Amino acid sequence: MTYPGPPRPVRISATPLAELADQLGVAAPDGSAEITGITHDSRAVRPGDLYAALPGARLHGADFVTQAAGLGAAAVLTDPAGAERAAAAGLPALVVDDPRARMGELAATIYGHPGRDLLQIGITGTSGKTTTAYLVEGGLRTAKSTGLIGTVEMRIGDERIKSERTTPEATDLQALFAVMRERGTEAVAMEVSSHALVLGRVDACVFDIAVFTNLSPEHMEFHSGMEDYFQAKAQLFTPKRSRLGVVNVDDEYGRRLAKEATVPVVTYSAEGHPDADWRADEVEVGPLDSTFTVLGPKGERIAAKSPLAGPFNVANTLAAIVALAAAGLDPQSAADGVAAVPGVPGRLERVDEGQPFFAVVDYAHKTDAVESVLRALRKVTEGKLHAVLGCGGDRDTTKREPMGAAVARFADTAVLTSDNPRSEDPLAILATMLQGAASVPAHERGEVQVFEDRAAAIAAAVARAEPGDTVLVAGKGHEQGQDIAGVVRPFDDRQVLREAIKKTQG
């Protein structure tokens, strides 16, 4: 039988419900239920599962307890509000005030604490998580059987699984770790979002290495401000969550974190910060990749190559090499493995149909990331730079004007368009972006165009491109759908860009 959701281990020992009750410090329900899995999704329940019925913004997971029971749930983890409904369904219940806060530890127990048998490297930061995770996994492959968990996909060996979110829920994450252990995986590179840290998705995880890339305004619809955002990230650098930190001291929040972290910290700098333990030197940035020398704390000189363009990818590559060295890999072997990574989906991903201009798709969807990628492309563009950009709906509204200003300032042609409008009016989002673009003085501003339709915007940018120019389509990267008014329709920037180029090629 095929079940929805991420994979689960084939072999698992049952855990008595009474043992889980004892772990929670609550009275054991009547009966002798045995638990062989856990899920927070009533649709993904398997026989023998503990169904975590969590309170939500609109609905309570206990509303679906009858469905869970019908699929074979053996018991329920819930709060007092959900306990009565669980009893009505005839299921024994573990009742705690905050079931989400206890879900991770129970999942780890049920699956036999699989994370303890894996070398775990977690990466957090506003930008660079995905790229750094791919580079770390590439380096790990030189010495170990690997797994990858992140925004684009999850990988167990050569099996690829589409990701629902950057960091899976704790129930799914512990199951993934158990599958990795069962299949002989030795090490995993994983993105850790601030949401994951705040919402308990990485509860029961203790990362061998925790990497901090940078911090800039993002997710302000979730965090109360930058201090709250920083404190969320800083949780990863405590003994409860990691054993060693690898921190970028080119970033102001990284410098603060290096001082405030309560685990040992190794620092790195792509800009040659004299106090950093590891530094990038002799950096040569090219149109497709960069080379540099890594200087280590013991006089190491390591030849390194970033397989991706841009100074920011020098920083990501350095982060990966330092993390791998901190994990005990030979630094030069690690650097060679990182250099061999073929690319990262949707991160400065080139689209080449033989056209006489450079065309790339990138996930940049924050002001600093947009500026960074435009600056990097400007350095390697002989002609003009044409950029397509939108802002997502139902997300941080404060970044819309700054992003409009950034693309207008750093591109010769700024084509403003829809991203994922979700429930918002696309034209209202574009109007705010246009205000930002208009705030840039005329002598510093490129030509600004507005197309509500994203495919039309991409076609317009391609139509303007001449030999030696660059076309950047930013914001969605690897995504393969566009959310408009709650309906997700197929849309892949890479494919749409490819088709637009083909049409110009005749």
Swiss-Prot record:
The modification N6-carboxylysine is found at residue 233. UDP-N-acetyl-alpha-D-muramoyl-L-alanyl-D-glutamate binds at residues 42, 166-167, 193, 201. One of its GO terms (cellular component) is cytoplasm. It is found in: Cytoplasm. It catalyses: UDP-N-acetyl-alpha-D-muramoyl-L-alanyl-D-glutamate + meso-2,6-diaminopimelate + ATP = UDP-N-acetyl-alpha-D-muramoyl-L-alanyl-gamma-D-glutamyl-meso-2,6-diaminopimelate + ADP + phosphate + H(+). It holds the Pfam family Mur_ligase. GO terms for biological process: cell division; cell wall organization; peptidoglycan biosynthetic process; regulation of cell shape. The keyword Cell cycle applies. SUPFAM superfamilies: MurD-like peptide ligases, catalytic domain, MurD-like peptide ligases, peptide-binding domain, MurE/MurF N-terminal domain. It comes from the Bacteria. Keywords: ATP-binding, Cell cycle, Cell division, Cell shape, Cell wall biogenesis/degradation, Cytoplasm, Ligase, Magnesium, Nucleotide-binding, Peptidoglycan synthesis. Its EC number is 6.3.2.13. InterPro entries: Mur-like_cat_sf (IPR036565), Mur_ligase_C (IPR004101), Mur_ligase_C_dom_sf (IPR036615), Mur_ligase_cen (IPR013221), Mur_ligase_N (IPR000713), MurE/MurF_N (IPR035911), UDP-N-AcMur-Glu-dNH2Pim_ligase (IPR005761). Belongs to the MurCDEF family. MurE subfamily. Catalyzes the addition of meso-diaminopimelic acid to the nucleotide precursor UDP-N-acetylmuramoyl-L-alanyl-D-glutamate (UMAG) in the biosynthesis of bacterial cell-wall peptidoglycan. This is UDP-N-acetylmuramoyl-L-alanyl-D-glutamate--2,6-diaminopimelate ligase. The gene is murE.
